[in-house]
Amino acid sequence: MSLPTYSKLNIVILAAGKGTRMNSSKPKVLHALAGKPVLQHVLDTARRLNPSSIIVVYGFGGEIVPQALPADDIIWVKQAEQLGTGHAMQQALPYLEPDARTLILLGDVPLLTQESCTQLLTQQAALCLLTVSKDNPSGYGRIVRQGDAVKAIVEHKDAAEAQLAIREVNTGIMAAENTWLATWLPRLDNRNAQQEYYLTDIVAMAVADGQAVAAVQSNDEWQVAGINSKQDLAALERVYQGRYAARLLAKGVTLADPSRIDVRGELTTGRDVEIDVGCVFEGQVTLADNVRIGPYCVIRDATIGAGTTLAAYTHIDGATLAEDCRIGPYARLRPGTVLSDHAHIGNFVELKNAQVDSGSKINHLSYVGDATVGKQVNIGAGTITCNYDGVNKFRTVIEDNAFIGSDSQLVAPVTIKAGATIAAGSTITEDAPADKLTMSRVRQFTIENWKRPEKVKK
């Protein structure tokens, strides 16, 4: 009998486990991989399959998991007691649509791809398993076959000696018709060494009911690897980063050392981009053509224009840089900062919510916050925009072609008019007129007969 074609897809993600070996009070599915929770990776894959519903079964940690990942398209189902994967699916059963298929994913298997899920779902069988062959299958449920047909999955602790020699193992990921799940799940029991309700027992039920059980064997062990310890988490992090680096190299990005780059979000690159060692990219980052990133830079939610260079140890967060800018080393650009073409921001300069127009330079040891800087402005070393009175923040405006001498304090709200020059060491509290020299400093004088104090002998 041919199997029906289902237009609806339910996805159930099992995410109730404690993860004892993580040695953490945090549910293991909330630990970060590449900058986002492990469970978020699984949710992202699930959403790409366009299911009619996503059901997440959670348990350990209580409401921490749904609170950490709020979303309108998720049905959260609590497994109050963690009594096994079969018990978890029993909790999800009332939310499954009768005329749909269900894809069962694991919340601690973050590298599974959409392609593998699709391959599983296209199998014409009431039940289909995703399996993998392991050199060391210890701890995994063994796939027991009769010829090519899957007859059962035997958990490691329940396996006979001959079954322990089997290398093909269950990944825990499967797809099934909901009409059959409604028949099999209520029949599960906990008569086994672990006294848990094994979801894998539905394989034997399917065979007993005369239903063929299909299996798709993955050739990528990492793609189906779960996280049970910090060692597992660290290993998968390096796999993820290594694969991301390989994709960047394939696009033509030059990486000084592919093993020393971390992407914790999405990195979009143009042509002839160069990235030195130790760089971290977080959130949504875009690097246009011919961008050069020096060693140990951290870039978060930023757009870097063509031809721009970031020297070593530069931090960019929530900023937009236009073309041919020169930044760093040791510069920090905070959220709201926008640089126009050919801006220069030098060492130990911090910008926050500052707009710097084309050709302007802030080359040394300065803080410019809540400021608008015009074209061709030069801001000397040690300049500070004093933007905060302890309660409110105020804005500084520096118009085109102004020159700010070193060690100046601009007390906002204040405007430095076009072409104005501020003498070094000035504290400016009022607007400075255009094309004039403004200064505010104590007159220098010398005490002729002064002597240094002498040390008192005790």
From Swiss-Prot:
Location (main, coarse): cytoplasm
InterPro entries referenced in this protein's UniProt entry, alphabetically: Bifunctional_GlmU, GlmU-like, GlmU_C_LbH, Hexapep, MobA-like_NTP_Trfase, Nucleotide-diphossugar_trans, Trimer_LpxA-like_sf
Cofactor list: Mg(2+)
Residues annotated to bind UDP-N-acetyl-alpha-D-glucosamine: 14-17, 28, 79, 84-85, 141, 155, 170, 228, 334, 352, 367, 378
Keyword Repeat attached: yes
Residues holding acetyl-CoA: 381, 387-388, 406, 424, 441
Cofactor binding summary note: Binds 1 Mg(2+) ion per subunit.
Example of a GO biological process term: cell morphogenesis
Region (Pyrophosphorylase) residue spans: 1-230
Linker, as annotated region: 231-251
Cellular location(s): Cytoplasm
Functional pathway: Nucleotide-sugar biosynthesis; UDP-N-acetyl-alpha-D-glucosamine biosynthesis; N-acetyl-alpha-D-glucosamine 1-phosphate from alpha-D-glucosamine 6-phosphate (route II): step 2/2; Nucleotide-sugar biosynthesis; UDP-N-acetyl-alpha-D-glucosamine biosynthesis; UDP-N-acetyl-alpha-D-glucosamine from N-acetyl-alpha-D-glucosamine 1-phosphate: step 1/1; Bacterial outer membrane biogenesis; LPS lipid A biosynthesis
Record's subunit section: Homotrimer.
Protein name: Bifunctional protein GlmU
Lineage: Bacteria, Pseudomonadati, Pseudomonadota, Betaproteobacteria, Nitrosomonadales
